[in-house]
């Protein structure tokens, strides 16, 4: 085989294995492709838990320009559908992530002064959704694949209204026997949450820092797994 062709083929296969969060639906109504999300050009994972890139991506994976200035209007208590695909060309509408990339799917929110602010360091994130390994041996990523790259979760109905960032994440742990091995795919969407709520959720955590390299959900051999602990704090809905 021609070496150049092999490299191109190998790179294409790796790219198809990876994934990007690229569309939001609010109660079933689509917000538009790439709208309201900070989208990287590359679908490569973040693997360094100490890097600020673990917050909203970017950095080593520069954002697709122009970065969306849309703010997604979300009533508290509504259902969000997040859609994942390997590329951002809006052509692939069924593939999401390669089936061997097993792992959890997670969602966090952080209240911010401005949903368009570029400084995301030091934000207080609370987890409100997680899906990991089910009793039947299927993973959250299996369910994502079966649903053509879509996952649904409910925005808490009681939280304070205002500007938020939604940090949506897939952690692929198929090669996580040692650190760095787990692959972190995340993007942040810009939300304005409306409603009469007044609750300030807790506990919260900051990124970097929410995950440790020796956490049981980060360094794990899924071939010898009996049960799985989703990384981070418990999800509070």
Curated annotation (Swiss-Prot):
Where does this protein hold Cu(2+)?
Answer: 18, 101, 185
Residues binding O2, per UniProt: 174, 183
Gene Ontology CC terms, in alphabetical order? extracellular region
Where located?
Answer: Secreted
Q: Glycosylated residues?
A: 92, 152, 192, 227
Organism superkingdom:
Eukaryota
Give the recorded use of this protein. Answer: Lignocellulose is the most abundant polymeric composite on Earth and is a recalcitrant but promising renewable substrate for industrial biotechnology applications. Together with cellobiose dehydrogenases (CDHs) an enzymatic system capable of oxidative cellulose cleavage is formed, which increases the efficiency of cellulases and put LPMOs at focus of biofuel research.
Q: Does the keyword Oxidoreductase apply?
A: yes
InterPro entries tied to this protein: AA9, AA9_LPMO
According to its UniProt record, this protein's enzyme class is oxidoreductase
Keyword Lipoprotein assigned: no
Cofactor dependence: Cu(2+)
EC number(s) on file: 1.14.99.56
Q: What does this protein do?
A: Lytic polysaccharide monooxygenase (LPMO) that depolymerizes crystalline and amorphous polysaccharides via the oxidation of scissile alpha- or beta-(1-4)-glycosidic bonds, yielding C1 or C4 oxidation products. Catalysis by LPMOs requires the reduction of the active-site copper from Cu(II) to Cu(I) by a reducing agent and H(2)O(2) or O(2) as a cosubstrate.
**Protein name as catalogued:** AA9 family lytic polysaccharide monooxygenase C
Its taxonomic path starts at:
Eukaryota, Fungi, Dikarya, Basidiomycota, Agaricomycotina
Q: Which gene encodes it?
A: LPMO9C
């Amino acid at each position: 085989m021609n070496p150049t062709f092999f490299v191109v083929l190998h790179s294409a296969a790796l790219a198809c294995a990876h994934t990007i969060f690229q569309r939001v639906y609010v109660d079933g109504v689509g917000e538009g492709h790439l709208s309201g999300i900070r989208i990287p050009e590359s679908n490569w994972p973040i693997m360094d838990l100490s890097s600020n890139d673990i917050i909203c991506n970017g950095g080593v994976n520069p954002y697709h320009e122009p970065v969306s200035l849309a703010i997604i209007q979300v009533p508290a208590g509504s259902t969000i559908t997040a859609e994942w695909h390997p590329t951002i060309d809006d052509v692939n509408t069924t593939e999401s992530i390669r089936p061997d990339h097993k792992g959890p799917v997670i969602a966090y929110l952080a209240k911010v002064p401005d949903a368009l602010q570029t400084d995301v360091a030091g934000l207080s994130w609370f987890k409100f959704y997680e899906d990991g390994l089910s009793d039947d041996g299927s993973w959250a990523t299996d369910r994502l694949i079966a649903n053509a790259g879509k996952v649904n979760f409910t925005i808490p109905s009681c939280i304070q209204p205002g500007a938020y960032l939604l940090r949506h994440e897939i952690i692929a742990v198929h090669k996580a026997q040692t650190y760095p091995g787990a692959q972190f795919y995340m993007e942040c969407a810009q939300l304005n949450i409306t409603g009469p709520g007044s609750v300030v959720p807790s506990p919260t955590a900051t990124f970097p820092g929410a995950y440790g390299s020796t956490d049981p959900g980060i360094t794990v051999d899924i071939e010898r797994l009996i049960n799985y602990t989703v990384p981070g704090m418990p999800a509070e809905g």
